[in-house]
Structures are given as C-alpha cells and as structure tokens.
C-alpha cells in the first residue's frame, strides 16, 4: 500500500539518496492499484506486481524491505514454485504495519513463526523488549529506528472545527457470520448505540465538534442500517477515500478499541480513548503483550457511559493530552525527530547482505 511504512521509506530513498545509492532500490505495486499514482513519478524504480521484471528481480534481490511478510511478494503463495523457493531464501527487513503491542503476533512474525524475518524494526524501548522477549529477536536484529511513516506526521487540527476520529477494528469471530447474525452482535449493537447516542450528539453540539467514523471495509455494508438516525455531526468516511494519516493529523482525538493506529495519534501528543466493551473475547482470541487493563496509555472504557464521560471531558478541555501520557511517551517513542527513514537506511547500509 502506497501510504504505509514501505512507501514512505521508498519515498525517502528516492528523494534523499544520490543516484548511486538508490540505483538498486525498487518498489513493487500493481499498476491497477489506486495507490499507483503516488509512486508513478519514480519511473524505472517502480515495478509492476507479477510482471516478468518483478519475477526476475525477486530472484536477484539482496533483501526485501516490507511492512508485511515477504510472502506477499508473490500472488500464488500457496503453490510451490521456483520463485516461491527463492523468496523463502531472501532476507527481510520488516518495517511493520503497526506497533507490536496490542495483538500477539509471535506465531506469525516471531523468530520461530511461520513468517519470520531477519530484522524487525521497532519504535522504542517497550516495543524492542517485546520483540526480544516475546518474538525471539535481539538488540541487533530488532533495532530501534521508529516508523518511516511517522517522519511526515504533524498536527494539522483546525481551531475552527475540531473532530474526533472513530476507528474501530474488525472482529475475527465475526468473519463468517450472516448479516442477521452480525446485526445482533455486540459489536454492531455497541457502535450503533454510540453513534445514535443523544448524549454524544449533545456533547458534539455544545463543543462545536464533529465525529468522523472511518469505516473498516468489512463494516461498510452495514452502515445504512443505522445511518439515517445519526446526527448530522457524524460523518462517515469509507476506507481509502481519504488517506488515514491525513485524518489522524487533522483529528483532535482518536476513539478506537485495539487498533495500532492509536500509536500514530499518541505520537502526535493527542488524546486516545479506548472503547473495549468486548475485551475478554478479544484477549481470548488474540491476546496482547501489554496489560490493557492496567498499563495502557490514554483512557480506557468498557461502557458507553464511561466513554462519553471521557469524550465530554476532553471536548470541554480543548483536547489536551493527559500529563501522565505525555510523560510516559519517551519509553514508547525513542525518537521524534523526523529521521526514522534515515535511521532505517543507515541500518541497512551498516549491515552486510
């Protein structure tokens, strides 16, 4: 995806390295993708996914740098082939999709996992300790560099009109349910209740604030079930319509549940509210590496009333981050200097491949 860590690292390389340094750096993307326009200007350094050139370059690459498993380099991942075997032998620097903390991934991305990699980029001391103690890496293979995409983050919220970004994650246990089953699920009922809450509407009205609901693709088909009853202070934005990082930069506060986007918003010193009404089910299904009941930053709620108390407090106090969260940030974010991509490149340059 040409919005994520892989894209921003590639962009840094194209715009900051000399011709010799960037000569052999390439970005793979399907030319039919909506994101292709973001990288088209880099010409010969952009390779069409599953093209002949792509296959040839897979065979000869020194290292894969990606925000997902290197298995995604190839469309037919389940079928044995010469290309698949070649990918398996290549080293990978994992840039990550989001901070590893709120969801256990060691069975997939751990050193002994099904999609292990040689190098695992981390963002601070807390995450590096997770990578070492839970995933099996070490200080050399889990360097603290920060995320490439964080280099472009800046606070763009407007004083004229504040908005709260609501971005819940999907639930794996709802993956195969029917429409009727979904509509009686706690997940649907809780978010439907929140979005139609008269109290929420009053808070938004009294503080001249909007709520922007960024819709997960798997939730999109159900929006019309309650959309008509919702206040005009609630806006729905389908996934992909506006770049997510743009929404995070413009928002005044985030409401999520278990999504790793919370770290991006926290990185910008903005308040984060966690609505975890189904925490026990989530913890049983996925687990986490930190105790979310006791050690989570931000404000955590398991009921709508508690969540709205927090919404009201922050809306009435200018959406200023809690002091305890501001003081805790350095243990999560080693760097906030817009040089994360440079550190990643320096790490690559200083290691033999």
Map each language-model feature to its residues.
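Active-site and donor-binding regions of nucleotide-sugar-utilizing enzymes
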Residues: 1-153
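Conserved catalytic-core segment of nucleotide-activated headgroup transferases in glycan assembly
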Residues: 4-10, 148-227, 301, 336, ...
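Short glycine-rich, flexible loops that bind phosphorylated cofactors or substrates
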Residues: 72-74, 173, 262-263
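Donor nucleotide-activated moiety binding/catalytic core segment of transferases
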Residues: 47-56, 217-263
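Catalytic binding pocket for nucleotide-activated donors in carbohydrate/polymer assembly enzymes
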Residues: 226-230, 260-332
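A short, gly/pro- and small-residue-rich
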Residues: 77-98, 183-193, 270-281
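Short active-site oxyanion
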Residues: 22-26, 115-120, 211, 250-253, ...
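C-terminal alpha-helix
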Residues: 310-317, 343, 347-351
């Amino acid at each position: 995806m040409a919005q994520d860590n892989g894209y921003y690292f590639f962009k840094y390389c194209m715009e900051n390295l000399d011709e010799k340094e960037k000569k052999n750096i390439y970005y793979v993307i399907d030319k039919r993708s909506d994101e292709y326009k973001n990288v088209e200007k880099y010409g010969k350094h952009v390779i069409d996914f599953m093209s002949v050139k792509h296959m040839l370059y897979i065979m000869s690459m020194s290292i894969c740098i990606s925000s997902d498993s290197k298995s995604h380099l190839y469309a037919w991942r389940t079928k044995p082939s010469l290309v698949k075997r070649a990918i398996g032998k290549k080293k990978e620097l994992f840039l990550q999709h989001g901070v590893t903390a709120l969801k256990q991934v060691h069975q997939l991305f751990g050193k002994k996992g099904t999609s292990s990699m040689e190098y695992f980029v981390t963002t601070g001391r807390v995450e590096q300790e997770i990578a070492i103690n839970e995933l099996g890496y070490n200080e050399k293979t889990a360097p603290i560099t920060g995320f490439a995409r964080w280099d472009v983050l800046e606070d763009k919220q407007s004083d004229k009109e504040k908005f709260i970004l609501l971005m819940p994650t999907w639930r794996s246990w709802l993956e195969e349910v029917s429409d009727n089953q979904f509509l009686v699920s706690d997940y649907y009922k809780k978010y439907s209740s929140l979005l139609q809450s008269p109290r929420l509407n009053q808070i938004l009205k009294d503080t001249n604030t909007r709520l922007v609901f960024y819709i997960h693709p798997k939730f999109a088909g159900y929006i019309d079930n309650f959309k008509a009853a919702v206040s005009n202070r609630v806006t729905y934005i389908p996934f992909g319509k506006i770049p997510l990082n743009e929404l995070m930069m413009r928002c005044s506060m985030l409401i999520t549940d278990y999504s790793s986007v919370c770290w991006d918003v926290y990185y910008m010193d903005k308040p984060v509210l966690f609505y975890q009404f189904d925490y026990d089910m989530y913890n049983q299904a996925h687990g986490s590496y930190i105790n979310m009941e006791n050690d989570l930053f931000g404000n955590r709620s398991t009921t709508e009333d508690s969540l709205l108390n927090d919404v009201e407090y922050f809306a009435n106090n200018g959406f200023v981050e809690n002091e305890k969260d501001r003081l805790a940030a350095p243990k999560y974010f080693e760097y906030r200097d817009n040089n994360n991509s440079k550190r990643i490149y320096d790490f690559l340059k200083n290691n033999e491949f």
